[in-house]
């Protein structure tokens, strides 16, 4: 997967390219992240990248000319078929379904806003989709872009040591993940659930599904409203609810 990034702070993306799962993906040639800074497309000695908004008001907007030229440079490097995404509070909210959709793209260009945002005409002429990571305000689009890169890269074959890790993550099937345990077997008097030590894979699968359903019911009940539960899932959820009556 190839991802181009338009950002005034390209050095921030070393967190993606140099560390963790994504860093290994870059090292192994499974993921490529290339950055362009609008500041490199300025022609004044101050390398100006912001401009005043028409109509007045507080704050500045990203200057149109450097931003457009940076996007055009990224498009030229990407070639045909690259989807251009603007990280914006006005965009579609990113969830696991959206991550799965975005992961089908082999090329993406992520545009990170700063200041009060981007000229609407740039969005209309250069941007294919807008995406948001939540209903809150950040200083820029870099952290949302890194969130998007990290989440979609997990679906690139070979990135995770065990591909089932991505398939069993929270939200993949619309449910929260089940609890997990490792050594020691007893920690401050709290024991690992015996079923996980039993070696009975059918019972372990059943326990994990039951806990996943129950945790979703307790913490994010609205997620269950959009799911068509199987007969087995309904039975397991009912069991969990009986066991956890207030």
Curated annotation (Swiss-Prot):
Origin: domain of life: Bacteria
EC number(s) stated in the UniProt entry for this protein: 2.1.1.228
Keyword presence, S-adenosyl-L-methionine: yes
CDD domains: TrmD-like
Catalysis performed (reactions): guanosine(37) in tRNA + S-adenosyl-L-methionine = N(1)-methylguanosine(37) in tRNA + S-adenosyl-L-homocysteine + H(+)
GO terms, molecular function: tRNA (guanine(37)-N1)-methyltransferase activity
Binding-site positions, S-adenosyl-L-methionine: 113, 133-138
Keywords assigned: Cytoplasm, Methyltransferase, S-adenosyl-L-methionine, Transferase, tRNA processing
GO cellular component annotations of the record: cytosol
Localization terms from the record: Cytoplasm
Family named by the database record: Belongs to the RNA methyltransferase TrmD family.
Protein's job: Specifically methylates guanosine-37 in various tRNAs.
HAMAP family xref list: TrmD
Protein name, UniProt field: tRNA (guanine-N(1)-)-methyltransferase
Organism: Yersinia enterocolitica serotype O:8 / biotype 1B (strain NCTC 13174 / 8081)
Gene it is expressed from: trmD
